[in-house]
A protein has these predicted regions:
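Conserved alpha/beta core of the MobA/IspD/sugar-nucleotide pyrophosphorylase nucleotidyltransferase superfamily
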Residues: 154-189
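Conserved donor-nucleotide/metal-binding helix-loop-beta segment in metal-dependent transferases, i.e.
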Residues: 99-127
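Acidic donor-binding segment of Leloir-type glycosyltransferases
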Residues: 42-66
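Short phosphate-binding loop-to-helix
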Residues: 57-90, 149
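Short, glycine-/small-residue-rich phosphate/pyrophosphate-handling segment
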Residues: 134-157
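A short, N-terminal amphipathic alpha-helix
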Residues: 25-43
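N-terminal nucleotide-binding beta1-loop-alpha1 segment
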Residues: 1-13
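Short aromatic-hydrophobic micro-motifs that form the base-stacking/packing surface
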Residues: 92-94
Length: 189
């Protein structure tokens, strides 16, 4: 899932610290890198975009990248829409701001979906960098989740309605300059 990578529309918390141009450049670079690095014959990489009109703006995207609109609603409603669209297949949703995501981590997520209805990849900030699902969706999936908070992951798990889930290793997403600096420190050691 990604927002239109234009100044003022992405990484707004990071932009307050480093400026809108730098934050947007970082996001564009990271998003393209993620798409390139996760391309694999074992799964389809599909970019779900917001606003929906951005799907038609092909100048940013390579023609071989499959893009779909996110649709209306809050983040939970948009993710629910994606899971419904791919209801007949195990599906994983990630954001474009997770630098250390790898094919191995995605492969593990799909393997875990072989025995569970959900898989989550917890983020350092209390959210998640990946959520995967297979089968019928719980009726109240994502309802009442406090987005962009330390409770996002725990609130989300509560909406699974006791369906079994697995967890992946914790990763850092990038929302602030401190996140970027922490990431740089981790990769230099």
């Amino acid at each position: 899932m990604a927002k239109e990578p234009l100044p003022g529309r992405v990484k707004t918390r990071l932009a307050r610290e480093v400026g809108s141009t730098v934050a947007t450049w970082w996001f564009r670079h990271q998003l393209k890198k993620t798409i390139r690095n996760l391309n694999d014959p074992r799964w389809d990489v599909i970019v779900s975009l917001s606003p929906d009109i951005f799907v038609k703006r092909r100048n940013f995207w390579s023609p071989e990248i499959n893009c779909i609109p996110q649709g209306r609603g809050n983040l939970g409603q948009k993710m629910r829409n994606i899971f419904k669209l791919f209801a007949n297949h195990p599906s994983c949703i990630i954001g474009g701001d997770i630098p250390n995501i790898t094919k191995l981590k995605i492969s593990k997520a799909f393997r875990k979906l072989g025995s569970r209805k959900f898989v989550v990849g917890p983020a350092e900030d209390g959210g998640f960098w990946l959520i995967g699902h297979q089968g019928q969706l719980p009726r109240k999936l994502f309802e009442g989740v406090r987005w962009s908070s330390p409770w996002t992951l725990s609130d989300t798990i509560e909406t699974f309605e006791d369906q079994p889930f697995s967890s992946l290793s914790k990763l850092q997403d990038v929302d602030s300059l401190a996140d970027l600096e922490a990431l740089k420190t981790k990769t230099n050691h």
